[in-house]
Design a protein with these regions (language model features):
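N-terminal glycine-rich FAD/FM-binding segment characteristic of electron-transfer flavoproteins
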Residues: 1-160
């Protein structure tokens, strides 16, 4: 404050009246989802870019056989193949399931940060040098389009 300075107070009314709420509700949208929160899942079958858009059908089938849920990497969400609410990783969710299947996931550090505390990690990738194998308890190197259906059928025979 400047000593001795004076200011004029001007009252201004923008036209508001107490009886008007000044808000118009245009629409009410309730968010409903059919998915389970992947953070609560005991078994996750997670797919990456290597699965491709059409490959998520076989992942869903494997998850159903195991009583698990499907999740994915950021690359999958960025490509618009799966919704963001099932994304695992630094920019997704951190999960700690009993079993985590990393299928077609290279193992970028951002993804690993969201799943490395899983009790058991099974990785399936065609690249034997993929970083995901560094954190996996079990690794299968090969064509996921052949391995996943075969694994699903074998598990279907023993899991009732």
């Amino acid at each position: 404050p400047i000593e001795g300075a004076k200011a004029e107070v001007i009252e201004y009314n923008p036209g508001f009246t107490p009886d008007n709420k000044y808000v118009e509700i245009m629409d009410i949208v309730k968010s409903v989802t059919d998915t389970v929160d992947i953070m609560d899942a005991k078994i996750l079958v997670s797919g990456g870019r290597g699965v491709g858009e059409e490959g998520f059908g076989m992942l869903k089938e494997l998850a159903e056989v195991l009583g698990g849920e499907v999740s994915c990497s950021r690359a999958v969400v960025d490509n618009g193949w799966q919704p963001r609410d099932i994304q695992v990783g630094q920019t997704g969710k951190t999960v700690r399931p009993n079993v985590y299947f990393a299928i077609g996931i290279s193992g970028a550090i951002q993804h690993v940060a969201g799943m490395e505390d899983s009790d058991l990690i099974v990785a399936i990738n065609k690249d034997e040098d993929a970083p995901i194998f560094d954190v996996a308890d079990y690794g299968i190197v090969g064509d996921l389009n052949k391995i996943v259906p075969a694994l699903t059928e074998k598990l279907r025979a023993v899991v009732k």
